[in-house]
């Protein structure tokens, strides 16, 4: 299926923001790489900030669609395992998006959408820890989310899948009862 110019701009911006960073990527470069005029970028997105917002929103829509099946699991142990598997699965499917997010980690736009996405995952995890009888399910959820964040960063910056998988299996074993 042919991409619209608007979609091409988004895809190109994502790649360049992931490679060079948001601040180091002028809209003129996005236009050149996408094969469109810079004016067309502003016609569709008005500003570079709005373009970034659109790239982040589109990325989280894709991530949400891809991860839905992982967090509807009723078995609490399987849910925890699914959440632990998310960094591997989602980074492999959306490497550029997560590379961009890694660069934008301190930006409000990135934090806002990441919190919105992770909130529902955290609610599901808290329910899983309650089902398993943990004394402090909220804290267990925070700890697990910190582990997931660390796994995400590790896999994003180090593509040694074997080492990553060993760590992942070790963490999963700690949650099996």
PLM regions: where:
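N-terminal intrinsically disordered/low-complexity leader segments
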Residues: 1-4
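Helix-turn-helix
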Residues: 8, 12, 16-50, 54
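An amphipathic alpha-helix signature
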Residues: 10, 77, 81, 85, ...
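Hydrophobic alpha-helical connector segments
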Residues: 54, 68-93, 144
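Short, basic, alpha-helical segments at the C-terminal edge of helix-turn-helix-like DNA-binding modules
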Residues: 57-62
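Amphipathic alpha-helical packing segments from all-alpha helical-bundle domains
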Residues: 64, 108-142, 169
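Short secondary-structure transition hinges
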Residues: 86-127, 153
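Hydrophobic alpha-helical segments that form the core
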Residues: 135-159, 164-174
